[in-house]
Swiss-Prot record:
Produces ATP from ADP in the presence of a proton gradient across the membrane. The catalytic sites are hosted primarily by the beta subunits. This is ATP synthase subunit beta, chloroplastic. F-type ATPases have 2 components, CF(1) - the catalytic core - and CF(0) - the membrane proton channel. CF(1) has five subunits: alpha(3), beta(3), gamma(1), delta(1), epsilon(1). CF(0) has four main subunits: a(1), b(1), b'(1) and c(9-12). It catalyses: ATP + H2O + 4 H(+)(in) = ADP + phosphate + 5 H(+)(out). Transmembrane segments: none annotated. Belongs to the ATPase alpha/beta chains family. It is a peripheral membrane protein. ATP binds at residues 156-163. Its EC number is 7.1.2.2. It is found in: Plastid, Chloroplast thylakoid membrane. CDD domains: ATP-synt_F1_beta_C, ATP-synt_F1_beta_N, F1-ATPase_beta_CD. It comes from Phaeodactylum tricornutum (strain CCAP 1055/1). Keywords: ATP synthesis, ATP-binding, CF(1), Chloroplast, Hydrogen ion transport, Ion transport, Membrane, Nucleotide-binding, Plastid, Thylakoid, Translocase, Transport.
Amino acid sequence: MVKTNLNKGYVTQIIGPVLDIKFSEGNLPPIYSAIKIILDDNTETIVEVQQLLGDNKVRAVSMRSTDGLKRGVEAIDLGTPINVPVGTPTLGRIFNVIGEPVDEQGEVKYDETLPIHRDAPAFTELETKPSIFETGIKVVDLLAPYRRGGKIGLFGGAGVGKTVLIMELINNIAKAHGGVSVFGGVGERTREGNDLYEEMKESGVINEKNFAESKVALVYGQMNEPPGARMRVGLTALTMAEYFRDVNKQDVLLFIDNIFRFTQAGSEVSALLGRMPSAVGYQPTLATEMGALQERITSTTQGSITSIQAVYVPADDLTDPAPATTFAHLDATTVLSRGLAAKGIYPAVDPLDSTSTMLQVGIVTEEHYATAENVKETLQRYKELQDIIAILGIDELSEEDRLTVARARKVERFLSQPFFVAEIFTGSPGEYVSLEDTIKGFLMVLNGELDDLPEQAFYLVGNIDQAIAKAETLK
């Protein structure tokens, strides 16, 4: 038998997803090491070291269910943190937290792996000049532009179009920036993960015939997984994204759905690890854990990772420590509105609630800034007049206010746009609208150059030329 120098220990205690493992004197694995445990039925469980307890024991968190584990089972120190496959072979596939494919499409032939725990880029590697990341979506680029290498919070309830917006962004970054996307499903519903996968195949974001031509890699750790998996799956997705940025020198979109579940999983494990809970029962290390994840998402001189994170707000309380800690890291927010979705205005991005730190003179052009402010002003005035219209009717408004309402309704409709991934639903071909065309279009509407066009001409079109052409067909 070949002699191996693997460091072995045995399980001494199991408390739910947390277990203690004893090693021989002087052979303690460092924190974040991966340890493999093989059960009687030959199934493997990977656990990650969280604490060194003294007496040659470590406390670890399991990435799989601990059902069937018993004390005395052998544990093998793998000598490294959890390593996951990276690079082009990951495209079009679904992985779990430890980098195993879970889509029943056969094994993944990969050349490289990377550890999920890595340092954030050094200051000298960072791209310091803020630049806008053009998405081709009018409402986003004009009113709440994304920062290249920034972090965006995506807020919205069920059924207002989060998934379709995410898929359109994946599609547009591939076409316009030659970039790829990584989707991290953190602690959300398995059904939603499956629906997203099926929709991506339908819309061509995932190419089943040739996975290498797909535009996205998927990493899932859903609600039914133990907290260890949900706590680490975000890091697995981030590691795959970092490879595309640092080695392939691409612009990468990283989606995390949902960032709150990352915090929630950490709080589930925290008490079992014997840590004193802090405010509202969250882990005392909440800000540190969030910072370790978020600081790795950034622009370097090689490429960028722009992250879009769905944010669940527990009980709609924005002061809850979990969302409050997340907000500190965000550069922009995209808020989806049920009211707009009910009107059929898609994408249902709320133009008054969505914000961005990029919308300031010096980063965007003066023309862009002035147009965006003018659009918001017009929509805000329309919002204020709606009560009067509802009670007295539009005829009771002054001439000036009636003109404002007419333009605001055109602006509202012009903020809608046909998506490439929604062609099946809308029957209209998708449109990518450049920032230049977007600004030009809204300027023309606000300056009154198109007051004689019917408002229906502005609904679900790309640039302003299409609206003018559509008006001709409506005559």
